[in-house]
Regions:
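ANL superfamily adenylate-forming
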Residues: 7-57, 165-213
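Conserved pre-ATP/AMP-binding loop-to-beta segment of ANL
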Residues: 43-65, 72, 98-104
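Conserved AMP-binding A3 loop
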Residues: 61-87
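Active-site loops of AMP-binding adenylate-forming
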Residues: 80, 234, 242-248, 255-273, ...
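Conserved AMP-binding/adenylation subdomain of ANL enzymes
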Residues: 84-104, 111-213, 223, 248
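Conserved ATP-binding/catalytic segment of the ANL
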Residues: 278-346, 363
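Adenylate-forming
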Residues: 299, 333-362, 391-411, 431-435, ...
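Conserved C-terminal "lid"/linker of ANL adenylate-forming enzymes
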Residues: 369-372, 378, 419-485
């Protein structure tokens, strides 16, 4: 077993002792690779060749544990068929991204995330060079020195890049220019899907490129043409913004149980707002109730030592129940609504998909994370955390003095800005689905405190358990004045 540091190595060793299993534990902080290489110096190459030839395509490639956003993590058994077949098909699916002498990928998602591991396999099957960012704190200089041509990221990263650029513009003329350029990018991208941009729009786009887009591309290394996004939905507005800037975001959809994207938009035909059609070798169907099911080369063999979970995971005819709900359009492109388990049913019987509200609200520069709540309650509300990195610049841009997150959580101007953001968010849904109240938390959600997964998804069950008293206070204070929808 390989661990990141000595502390984890000690924990694994203690667990193996308690289980009475003989396990060799290596810490990467203690020359683990050198020790393994040394141990293998005297092994006959014939033995290595025999072991290699003994492998079969349906043998276990890796056991990857699910993120546990809604429950206890489970060990997903992935096979060599998954690890070889889907990346092989993926290279032919998006050759414009993966083929060419100058192709370069910089990975900054942790390899604990199955999507990052898949992209590494995909890149090896394609052309070019793969680089790894050792620390996200050095991501910007790493991007500028490595000059990647494509990236893998989660939507939250794209949201933060946009918000940082908006905040950096400051106020006054510079801010007006940035927001004008953003509007031009979005309009230009939408026009590409319709009759094409007009002459005046093309001229405005060229001007915006000189003033804004070229600088933004330079921040990311100057050569990024494509961004593969997964792990959650990206708002259509941001998708159009990035394409208008010159970096097409190819949204995909997959699970740990599918080793990588079961569906993904292509470089040739992308529908912003969808997660694309099934990758070759995979099939997707949607039941009459909207449940998404997958079958094909990427689907895992089952959960390790968990017959009960396996029975729940697969249909009688062998399709994987994803637990997500959505729809397929006439061209076979998949659109995600949300997780079935995360659907909120209000006291009035209204079904509410929290992801739609959370994704829109998280686009505000002050907001770090959002959890929408309201199950069995008379109305929908939200828990909001502030982005500590963005807060100082936002305060400066709005002529406010420096303050801590704790102070900002009670500040009238900050609360008023969040209230306006909630109002804009509510424009996307009906009144019964709208957020009527919110609370600002003083602690953010992180991996360290157990409220975020490595792909920056909120562990909803853990967050609701930790802040149950805050949720209770929302409904206690509003119960007498808020009608049930």
């Amino acid at each position: 077993v390989f661990t990141e540091n000595a502390k984890l190595a000690k924990l694994v060793y203690q667990a193996s002792q308690e289980a009475k299993q003989q396990v060799s534990v290596f810490s990467l902080a203690d020359e683990a690779i050198a020790k393994v290489n040394s141990a293998g110096e005297n092994i006959d190459m014939d033995v290595v060749e025999q072991r290699t030839k003994a492998l079969r395509i349906d043998d276990i490639y890796s056991i990857v544990y699910t993120s546990g956003t809604t429950g206890r993590p489970k060990g997903a058994v992935l096979t060599h068929r998954n690890a070889a077949g889907l990346p092989h098909n993926g290279v032919d699916w998006i050759p414009q991204v993966l083929r060419g002498e100058d192709v370069r990928l910089l990975l900054f998602l942790p390899l604990a995330h199955v999507y990052a591991r898949f992209l590494q396999l995909l890149a090896i099957g394609g052309d070019g060079v793969v680089g790894h960012c050792a620390n996200v704190k050095t991501l910007l200089p790493d991007l500028q020195s490595f000059h990647p041509t494509y990236l893998l990221c989660v939507p939250r990263v794209l949201e933060k890049v946009y918000n940082a650029a908006d905040a950096k513009a400051g106020s006054g003329t510079k801010l007006k220019i940035f927001r004008w350029a953003a509007k031009v990018a979005i309009t230009y991208s939408r026009a590409l899907d319709e009759a094409g941009p007009s002459t005046s729009l093309k001229l405005a786009h060229r001007a915006a490129d000189r003033l804004v887009y070229s600088t933004l591309r330079s921040m990311l290394g100057g050569n990024v043409r494509y961004v593969i996004s997964g792990g959650g939905p990206l708002g259509e507005r941001l998708g159009h913004f990035y394409r208008g800037v010159g970096m097409s975001v190819l949204e995909g959809y997959g699970l740990t149980e599918t080793i990588g994207p079961a569906t993904v938009n292509t470089a040739v035909q992308s529908k912003i707002g969808t997660v694309g059609p099934p990758v070759t070798g995979n099939s997707v169907r949607v039941t009459v109730d909207g449940d998404i099911e997958i079958k094909g080369i990427g689907v895992f063999a089952g959960y390790l030592n968990n017959d009960e979970a396996n029975a729940e995971a697969f249909t009688a005819d062998g399709w994987l129940r994803t637990g997500d709900i959505g729809s397929l359009d006439e061209d076979g492109y998949l659109r995600i609504t949300g997780r079935r388990k995360e659907l909120i049913i209000t006291a009035g019987g209204k079904n509410v998909a929290p992801a739609i509200l959370e994704d829109r609200l998280r686009g505000h520069p002050l907001v770090s994370q959002v959890v929408v709540v309201g199950d069995n309650q008379p109305f929908i509300s939200a828990l909001i955390t502030l982005d500590a990195d963005m807060l100082p610049q936002w305060l400066k841009n709005h002529g406010l003095e420096e303050m801590s997150v704790e102070q900002a959580a009670k500040n009238p101007e900050v609360l008023a800005a969040l209230d306006r953001a909630v109002e804009r968010t509510n424009e996307a849904v009906s009144r019964a689905e709208s957020i009527r109240s919110f609370r600002v938390l003083t602690d953010d959600f992180t991996e360290a405190n157990g409220l975020l997964t490595p792909s920056l998804k909120v562990k909803r069950a853990a967050a609701l358990a930790k802040y149950a008293d805050v949720v209770d206070s929302i409904y206690a204070s509003k119960a007498s004045s808020m009608p049930t929808d």
